[in-house]
């Protein structure tokens, strides 16, 4: 067993700083009791922010983690999409030859006035640069590229994107959009669902890295999956999982592990209860496809290998 604080330092040293931020990816499973898990979750999130990552927390108690799109929606709700658009826009206008004179969000009219140039020509040059930087960046899925391009155009205030369309894009990213017809003008025709949610999630860390962040750190707390029986109705809070939902959640995690070659600049830390290793009905034994990918059948009884995909942590301090 590894001390929780020591493992956070290990993750930072071996993964967050020097590997993931250079284009790598990792999916780590951490087993801990409730007391240790809560502190570890906060500590690893703080370490991620200090290392330059955007951190998103997903809890199986409040998010339906057996659906990939719901994981993406929860992550998306914790992202400041407009801030990223402004960062990308400032880089684009500078590359087009019109660096923003102030720290405020550059708009087409203000830049045209400052540089004494025609608004239409400036808009054309910046649009061309945005197209090159975003729409032709094929490391991101097409719908994601279109959405980011439209958010940048909305920030530039050229009139190409209405406030209604801007709001619809944000709602679409967060899973709150009711009618897809609101995005016809943006040329986005599909909802984010099982068929494209994984690619949307994989596009996000690339977009973050493009805009100056180290990448994306996602902390997924799956301790709720171990709850077999729902409490009385008046005591229930959040999500509970049937046997089928449990297996679907494990399949989502299995897909993340198998997709690490496609994923870049992203670290996923999955926090689980000790029952993950001991409960035959709701633990790893229930889904061999996941167990075979992370379980260490041969290991030191007194000390875990911190490089392993599955690590047991506790409150005691053990040097790693």
Where are the language model's segments positioned?
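A short linear-motif detector with a strong N-terminal bias
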Residues: 6-10, 34-38, 196-198, 247-250
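P-loop NTPase nucleotide-binding core
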Residues: 20-211
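Pre-Walker A adenine-sensing motif
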Residues: 1-22
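The catalytic "switch" region of P-loop NTPases
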Residues: 155-320
């Amino acid at each position: 067993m590894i001390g929780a604080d020591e493992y956070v330092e290990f993750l930072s040293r071996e993964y967050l700083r020097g590997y993931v931020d250079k284009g790598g990816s990792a999916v780590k499973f951490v087993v801990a009791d409730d007391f240790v898990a809560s502190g570890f979750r906060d500590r690893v999130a703080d370490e991620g922010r200090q290392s330059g990552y955007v951190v998103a927390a997903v809890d199986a108690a409040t998010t339906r983690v057996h659906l990939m799109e719901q994981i993406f929606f929860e992550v998306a709700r914790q992202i400041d999409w407009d801030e990223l658009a402004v960062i990308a826009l400032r880089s684009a206008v500078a590359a087009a030859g019109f660096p923003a004179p102030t720290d405020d969000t550059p708009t087409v009219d203000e830049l045209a006035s400052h540089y004494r140039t025609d608004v239409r020509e400036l808009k054309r040059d910046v649009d061309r640069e945005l197209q090159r930087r975003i729409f032709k960046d094929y490391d991101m899925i097409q719908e994601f590229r279109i959405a980011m391009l439209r958010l940048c155009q909305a920030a530039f205030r050229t009139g190409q994107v209405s406030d209604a369309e801007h709001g619809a894009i944000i709602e679409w990213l967060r899973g709150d959009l009711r009618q897809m017809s609101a995005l016809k003008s943006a040329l986005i025709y599909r909802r984010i669902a099982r068929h494209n949610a994984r690619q949307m999630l994989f596009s996000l860390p690339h977009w973050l890295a493009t805009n100056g962040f180290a990448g994306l750190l996602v902390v997924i707390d799956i301790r709720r999956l171990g709850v077999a029986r729902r409490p009385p109705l008046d005591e229930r809070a959040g999500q509970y999982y049937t046997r089928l939902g449990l297996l679907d959640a494990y399949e989502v995690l299995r897909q993340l592990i198998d997709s690490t070659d496609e994923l870049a600049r992203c670290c996923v830390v999955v926090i689980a209860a000790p029952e993950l290793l001991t409960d035959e009905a709701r633990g790893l034994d229930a889904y061999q496809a996941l167990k075979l990918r992370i379980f260490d059948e041969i290991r030191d009884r007194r000390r875990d290998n911190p490089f392993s995909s599955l690590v047991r942590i506790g409150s005691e301090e053990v040097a790693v």
